[in-house]
From Swiss-Prot:
It comes from Salmonella arizonae (strain ATCC BAA-731 / CDC346-86 / RSK2980). The lineage of its organism: Bacteria, Pseudomonadati, Pseudomonadota, Gammaproteobacteria, Enterobacterales. The gene is aroA. PROSITE patterns: EPSP_SYNTHASE_1, EPSP_SYNTHASE_2. This is 3-phosphoshikimate 1-carboxyvinyltransferase. The keyword Amino-acid biosynthesis applies. Monomer.
Length: 427
């Protein structure tokens, strides 16, 4: 297996222009495809997940052109539901941001489509979304294991009264919200259980509004969506930088700054993961906010005990930042780590122990006590981009770290290690 050994880093200092947000990129692509008119998306993320969405849209007959660097996409909208040409099978890799919204969107009309993906995708639950779509009339079959992809979709979704379980993934609610305006009937969506990752729903609602559709949101417990609507292109749309990707650089600044400044997000960002900066500040770092940047300056870091339900992806970065904090850090209410690209709770606990940390892994929490000195270890990445990027922070100690399968960062940030090196001074 390919590996990358990062030598100890003495100091980080500088600015990083963030790649486009994965969450925003794939939502914007799908809405542009469903909309009337031509949309020009700029600062689009070039990554595996976005390529899977683009390939699917192409197979569904959507016309688009990409710039040479794949960060600008001119897309001609369909002016309504996507139409599958005959029997179509779409391979979506391990891209949850493509699988879940497309599963809902392709239930409009009378298409017949199969959605499949990598082996890990077949372990990521989709049953709650399927149950909700069936309540709205959708005809869906599981082709292998009940409640998991691959799926055969035969259209039929018309709207109506729907319940969705919000406790596993906010992507299920996102998928329903984006599809419901195009259904013939009005849709009332009631959320069961605690809604995880609520800020990601705000991203969805913000983008829907940009494309001309507004809905009634009753305290995130009930959403009322008028049927028979159309999305309309906003013309040009700038994809803001990826706030989850910002977390690694901001954490590096907190640990070994200097000051690290990330541009492309700021105090006005729609992404909930900008709240990661507040967590670093609580730990002892100094944060400066601008409209289009966040900067982090080193501070003496102290352990925290926090509910991380609102920023589950960025919370992973706190788990490795905890290696540099005084005391025992506890991250709570993170059950949905278990249904991401890998079982992230298990993976994080396993790899933190390799570098010498004392770790308690609960069903929905992790407790981390750093060692007096970090150990050099080969870090398994579980084909999970965030595991690779989180554990790069170990190099901010006086100990090297070896990252196995470093190219797994292609899911969201193909040149991550080059960008980290650019702001780093070797020890």
């Amino acid at each position: 297996m390919e590996s990358l050994t990062l030598q100890p880093i003495a100091r980080v200092d500088g600015a990083i222009n963030l790649p486009g947000s994965k969450s925003v990129s794939n939502r914007a692509l799908l809405l542009a495809a469903l909309a009337c008119g031509k949309t020009v998306l700029t600062n689009l993320l070039d990554s595996d997940d976005v390529r899977h969405m683009l390939n699917a849209l192409s197979a569904l007959g959507i016309d688009y052109t990409l710039s040479a660097d794949r960060t600008r996409c001119d897309i001609i909208g369909n002016g309504g539901a996507l139409r599958a040409p005959g029997d179509l099978e779409l391979f979506l890799g391990n891209a949850g941001t493509a699988m879940r919204p497309l599963a809902a969107a392709l239930c409009l009309g009378q298409n017949e489509t199969v959605l499949t993906g990598e082996p890990r995708m077949k372990e990521r639950p989709i049953g709650h979304l399927v149950d909700s779509l069936r309540q709205g009339g959708a005809n869906i079959d599981y082709l292998e294991q009940e409640n998991y992809p691959p799926l055969r979709l035969r259209g039929g979704f018309t709207g109506g009264d729907i319940e969705v379980d919000g406790s596993v993934s906010s992507q299920f609610l996102t998928a329903l919200l984006m599809t419901a305006p195009l259904a013939p009937k009005d849709t009332i969506i009631r959320v069961k259980g605690e809604l995880v990752s609520k800020p990601y729903i705000d991203i969805t609602l913000n983008l829907m509004k940009t494309f001309g559709v507004e809905i009634m949101n009753h305290h995130y417990q009930q959403f009322v969506v008028k049927g028979g609507q159309q999305y309309h292109s906003p013309g040009r749309y700038l994809v803001e930088g990826d706030a989850s990707s910002a977390s690694y650089f901001l954490a590096a600044g907190a640990i070994k700054g200097g000051t690290v400044k990330v541009t492309g997000i700021g105090r006005k960002s729609m992404q909930g993961d900008i709240r990661f900066a507040d967590v670093l500040e609580k730990m002892g770092a100094t944060i400066t906010w601008g409209d289009d940047f966040i900067a982090c300056t080193r501070g003496e870091l102290h352990a925290i005990d926090m509910d991380m339900n609102h920023i589950p992806d960025a919370a992973m970065t706190i788990a490795t930042t905890a290696l540099f904090a005084k005391g025992t850090t506890t991250l709570r209410n993170i059950y949905n780590w278990r249904v991401k690209e890998t079982d992230r709770l298990f993976a994080m606990a396993t790899e933190l122990r390799k570098v010498g940390a004392e770790v308690e892994e609960g069903d929905d929490y992790i407790r981390i006590t750093p060692p007096a000195k970090l150990h050099h270890a080969d870090i398994g990445t579980y084909n999970d981009h965030r595991m690779a990027m989180c554990f790069s922070l170990v190099a901010l100690s006086d100990t090297p770290v070896t990252i196995l399968d470093p190219k797994c960062t292609a899911k969201t940030f193909p040149d991550y290690f080059e960008q980290l090196a650019r702001i780093s001074t070797p020890a």
